[in-house]
C-alpha cells in the first residue's frame, strides 16, 4: 500500500489538568520546560523529516463564522498541526506516541485523519 497523507492536530484541554499544571508553574519553570520542549520537538522533527510533508505549526486564537454570518471568538482544543505520510492510519497515529508536545508541553492528544484526495 502506498503512503498516504495524514493531518495531525495536537489538542489541549484549556481547562484540563495538564493545562492547570503548566499554569501553576513559575515563569522560570515554564521557560525551562519550554526550552527542553522546543529542543525535543526539533529532535523529533529531525528524526521524522522524511515523513513530514508539511511542518505546520502552532495555532492561534480562533474565530468562527456561522451559517448566518455571525463571527465570534471560540475556544477549542486545537493547538498545533502538521501533515505526515504513513502506510496506514494506525501507523500515522502511532507516530505521535510520546511526542514532546504531550510528554513535555501540556498537549493531551493528537487527532490524526487522512487527507482525502492528497
Where is each model-derived feature located?
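Conserved, structured core segments of small domains
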Residues: 1-118
Amino acid at each position: 500500500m502506498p503512503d498516504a497523507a495524514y493531518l495531525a492536530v495536537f489538542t489541549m484541554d484549556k481547562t484540563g489538568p495538564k493545562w492547570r499544571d503548566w499554569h501553576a508553574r513559575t515563569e522560570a519553570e515554564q521557560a525551562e520546560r519550554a526550552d527542553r520542549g522546543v529542543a525535543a520537538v526539533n529532535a523529533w522533527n529531525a528524526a521524522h523529516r522524511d515523513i513530514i510533508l508539511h511542518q505546520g505549526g502552532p495555532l492561534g486564537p480562533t474565530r468562527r463564522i456561522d451559517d448566518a454570518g455571525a463571527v465570534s471568538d471560540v475556544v477549542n482544543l486545537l493547538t498545533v498541526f502538521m501533515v505526515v505520510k504513513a502506510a496506514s492510519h494506525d501507523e500515522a497515529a502511532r507516530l505521535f506516541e510520546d511526542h514532546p508536545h504531550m510528554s513535555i508541553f501540556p498537549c493531551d492528544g493528537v487527532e490524526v485523519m487522512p487527507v482525502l484526495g492528497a
